[in-house]
């Protein structure tokens, strides 16, 4: 298997990369500077979202999203066990309980047919994970969430750029997370 040649990519864009890095070094705004505002604008436009907020990691973005929704002790979050540990970890960090729904054999994403059975009066959020560049059926997931008065957070760490029904990953739910 041939790997991506990062050095060749760098050399192709070396002048632009170094000029942008020098600009950051000169103005000294290593975080929250104009380059970040530019990146956030480009990310939002790319996925068709009204806003994009960059943070340190995908893990941080999931935790921030849960906290912004007021998820805490006694709440449940429906997600999948077949994902990186951060997805379940942040649910526990905010004091909530992860409720696992198995994956569908066809695409390794959450089995949408099993979500409704996992919803209880304590459920606050559906947190499906898009894996291997594939997205679960967000039309059905969003409809279930609406029916039950739940929020949806898309964990799109592995699907940035994927599309479904003309919408890009990170633009199919009110809150999405990528890394």
Each model region followed by its residue ranges:
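Generic alpha-helical secondary structure signal
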Residues: 12, 16-20, 34, 38, ...
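N-terminal "arm"/small-domain region of PLP-dependent enzymes with the aminotransferase-like
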Residues: 1-29, 34
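Solvent-exposed, non-membrane alpha-helical residues enriched in polar/charged side chains
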Residues: 18-22, 40-44, 63, 67, ...
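PLP-dependent aminotransferase-like
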Residues: 67-159, 163
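Conserved active-site segment immediately N-terminal to the catalytic lysine
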Residues: 154-179
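Phosphate-binding glycine-rich loop
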Residues: 29-76, 90-94, 100-102, 167
């Amino acid at each position: 298997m041939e790997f991506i040649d990062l050095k060749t990519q760098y050399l192709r864009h070396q002048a632009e990369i170094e000029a942008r890095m020098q600009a950051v070094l000169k103005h000294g705004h290593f975080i929250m500077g104009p380059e970040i505002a530019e990146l956030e604008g480009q990310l939002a436009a790319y996925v068709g979202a009204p806003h994009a907020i960059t943070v340190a990691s995908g893990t941080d973005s999931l935790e921030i999203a849960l906290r912004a929704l007021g998820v805490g002790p006694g709440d449940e979050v429906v997600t999948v066990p077949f994902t990186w540990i951060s997805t379940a970890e942040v649910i526990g960090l905010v004091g909530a309980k992860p409720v696992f729904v198995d994956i569908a054999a066809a695409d390794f994403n959450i089995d949408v047919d099993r979500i409704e059975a996992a919803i209880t009066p304590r459920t606050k959020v559906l947190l499906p994970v898009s894996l291997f560049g594939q997205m679960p059926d967000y039309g059905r997931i969003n409809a279930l969430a609406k029916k039950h008065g739940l929020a949806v957070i898309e964990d799109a760490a592995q699907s940035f750029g994927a599309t479904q029904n003309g919408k890009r990953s990170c633009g199919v739910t009110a809150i999405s997370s990528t890394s």
